[in-house]
């Protein structure tokens, strides 16, 4: 996944920002063709989506010290977009109560069919899987604090709101 901060459509497509991107491309160690070849070598699926999400500062902070990522892409059932967003917020309350990182929520503006995606940043696979180390009592309390009846309700509730979803894990490519 590649994230390109835009700030706004007006600013992103302003002559100054277009000139900055052109200069950056000209100064790059890779030609546009070489960049696309490298991108293709690491990509199995490509789709463009424009989203609203956390601030650039929040994204940068989430990426600090991490190299393992969990991405969940969701298409809501008709009329369930708002409830899906709320469910994702509830899951964040649950995660934070367990001492885990909050996932970033990005909401579709244009492009791909997805209504939203979440991106969680972790140090490594063990960090991502660490919720299994939490006691059942603590998980139950965290679920209730987040608005769920139990931790076992979280996944099934999500599925009442979505037509489909994809999730995957990835590592940083540098």
Region spans (language model):
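Short S/T/G/P-rich N-terminal loop/turn motif that feeds into the first structured element of a domain
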Residues: 1-174
């Amino acid at each position: 996944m590649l994230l390109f901060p835009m700030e706004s459509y007006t600013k992103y497509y302003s002559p100054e920002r277009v000139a900055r991107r052109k200069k950056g491309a000209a100064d790059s160690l890779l030609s546009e063709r070489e960049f696309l070849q490298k991108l293709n070598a690491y990509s199995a699926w490509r789709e463009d989506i424009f989203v609203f999400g956390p601030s650039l500062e929040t994204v940068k902070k989430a990426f600090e010290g991490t190299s393992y990522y969990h991405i969940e892409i969701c298409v809501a059932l008709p009329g369930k977009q708002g409830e899906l967003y709320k469910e994702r917020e509830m899951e964040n309350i649950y995660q934070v109560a367990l001492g885990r990182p909050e996932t970033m929520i990005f909401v579709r503006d244009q492009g791909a069919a997805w209504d939203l995606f979440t991106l969680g940043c972790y140090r490594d696979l063990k960090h991502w899987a660490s919720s299994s180390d939490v006691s059942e009592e603590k998980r139950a309390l965290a679920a209730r604090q987040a608005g769920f009846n139990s931790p076992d309700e979280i996944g099934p509730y999500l599925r009442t709101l979505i037509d489909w979803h994809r999730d995957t894990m990835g590592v940083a490519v540098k």
